[in-house]
Amino acid sequence: MRISWMIGGAQGSGVDTSANIFGNAVAASGYYIYGNREYYSNIKGRHSYFNLTISDKPPRSIAQQIEILTSFDAETIFQHFNEVKDVLIYSTEVENTKAEQVQSMEPEITEHVVKFLKEKGYGTTVKDVINYLKKEKGVKVIPIDYMEILKKVADQAKVQLSVADRARNTIAIAASYKLLGLKEQYLINSITRTFRQEVFAKINTIAAQLAMQQIQPMYNLPELPNNEEKINLDGNTAAAIGKIYGGLRFQSYYPITPASDESVFIEAHQTVFTVDPKTGEKRKSTIVVVQAEDELAAINMASGAALTGVRAATATSGPGFSLMVEGMGWAGMNEVPVVITYYIRGGPSTGQPTRTSQADLMFALNAGHGEFPRIVIASGDHVEAFHDGTWALNLAQKYQTPVIHLVDKALANSYSIIPKKTLGMENIRIEKGKIVINTNTPELKRFEITEDGISPFAPLGTARVHYTGDEHDEYGFIAEASENREKMYEKRIKKLMTADKEIPEESRVNVYGNTDSKVAIITWGSPKGAILDAMEELENEGIKPMLIQIRMFSPFPKNLMRKLLNGKEFIIDVESNYFGQAGEVLKLNTGIEPTHYILKWNGRPMMRDEVKEGIKAVVQKGERRVVLHGGA
């Protein structure tokens, strides 16, 4: 069972809060949630919406075609009316609003809406859209007089109408919640947990009760057993918690969308407690979080902290990473165990700050002048983002090299309500590598040439060590002799070879579905969920592909990829960029090139129904390159 639900409204009007109230209430009834928020890069006023999937088992994606659309403005209706399958809930106040009158709507969107409606023989008001939905698509339309309800709220709560108006979005979620047929008290509980101030809890509770009185249940979902602890995770929070569990002690950042939320979360949870495994003693510790003056300062601060022996990281997005590249090169030259969590958004330049992309894969793999090792991993869901927060810190300290953790914006700003046990927190392990505290020598060969390329690491203050951006000898002193250059160059690169030998290729790739299928799909990052959900539906239509999700791009799991792709008729690369960059990396490392591509670069996340149709277009129609366009 799956139901897709969407709420939309003006940026800053509480769309995100409303969706979380709704989702938590549904989760209290025993259901699982996956949701994604889309918003413009402005503070207030532009169109924002939240797309959410409800299921009796954990969903992994959203859909373009939705069962329920609930709105409290005209623009949401104009932007999304062709995505509605079952029900539209709307405010009667906007019935006579014309598409041409919505000033916040971009001209090309207005033009498209007007053209579509006129070609279908309708006018351009909300009422015309409603008539189209009822006659052409059989959608059930539920009008609600928001103002009438708000006046009653003001009267019952004894507040001014302007105060009661802040419960407008609660009317929308309450009406759609009642359609599901779930216990009303769960929604009330979710409201009171969200609004701590008594007056706002009161007006929103009254608004919800009045709205639900006007609606008859339509779906009649049964209440499911809810005896397991659940957790509400978005990608930013998952990565942050993973870092905290992984022993992070220093985080630097410069504010940038969509990376800032991770650092803000860590800043709000700076005090941590650890337990000594030998004595059982509980110890209090602190994570230092610094908002730097710019991104170059942020990466250099993190590198400096890492050299003291603590686990250190920074977080940024495309424009910020561009500025960090010089500092990352210094970290590469000095073999600094620093982690960069790279939240990928639309580029180039400022690009699309609040939209998703996977166009920075090649940049992450090759950024910086000269050649130096870096490990690059990519998360595909919230559980992986959690584990990768720790994994990145382990890899950085073990191999003494920068680690880049890729999280695309679609994963960062989506959230899921899942069983807490699926996180496997009890399986977290800390790996530190060759850290030497008592060196018994005043001066350490910090860059000692070893068989595996990894040298003893003494934290600053425990032995005399030297660091410079220049080429250096084993002690760290500047040295330009050709023989030394060759040895130190090879020593650094050898660490990546060591990592390639030691890290099982099976841990660098996830494989799903029918491994004997003639159809193999390769992907990375957030498209994973949409593909897996699409595969479930395709199985009923006789298409049973295999999915290969790449978890680590450097070092690349080339031997396993060759084995998995051997003899496949269809090798379909699915990702959110124009060139199919993962396919390019595959070809570079294995000589195997994808035969087909399903790509998307409009800044919106991949959705299961459009991915499903894309796979069918490849397998059944032989289309070599399918471009997806879903999302407003």
UniProtKB/Swiss-Prot annotation:
A motif (YPITP motif) lies at residues 254-258. Substrate binds at T257, R345. It comes from the Archaea. Catalyzes the coenzyme A-dependent oxidative decarboxylation of different 2-oxoacids such as 2-oxoglutarate, pyruvate and 2-oxobutyrate to form their CoA derivatives. Optimum temperature is 70 degrees Celsius. It catalyses: a 2-oxocarboxylate + 2 oxidized [2Fe-2S]-[ferredoxin] + CoA = an acyl-CoA + 2 reduced [2Fe-2S]-[ferredoxin] + CO2 + H(+). Optimum pH is between 7-8. This is 2-oxoacid:ferredoxin oxidoreductase subunit alpha. Its EC number is 1.2.7.11. GO terms for molecular function: 2-oxobutyrate synthase activity; 2-oxoglutarate synthase activity; pyruvate synthase activity. The Tyr-Pro-Ile-Thr-Pro (YPITP) motif is important for the turnover of the reaction, presumably through its flexibility and mobility. Heterodimer composed of an alpha and a beta subunit. Pfam families: PFOR_II, POR, POR_N. InterPro entries: 2-oxoacid/accept_OxRdtase_asu, 2-oxoacid_Fdx_oxidoreductase, PFOR_II, Pyruvate:ferred/Flavod_OxRd, Pyrv/ketoisovalerate_OxRed_cat, Pyrv_Fd/Flavodoxin_OxRdtase_N, Pyrv_flavodox_OxRed_cen, THDP-binding. GO terms for biological process: response to oxidative stress. It is an enzyme of class 1 (oxidoreductase). Keywords: Oxidoreductase, Pyruvate.
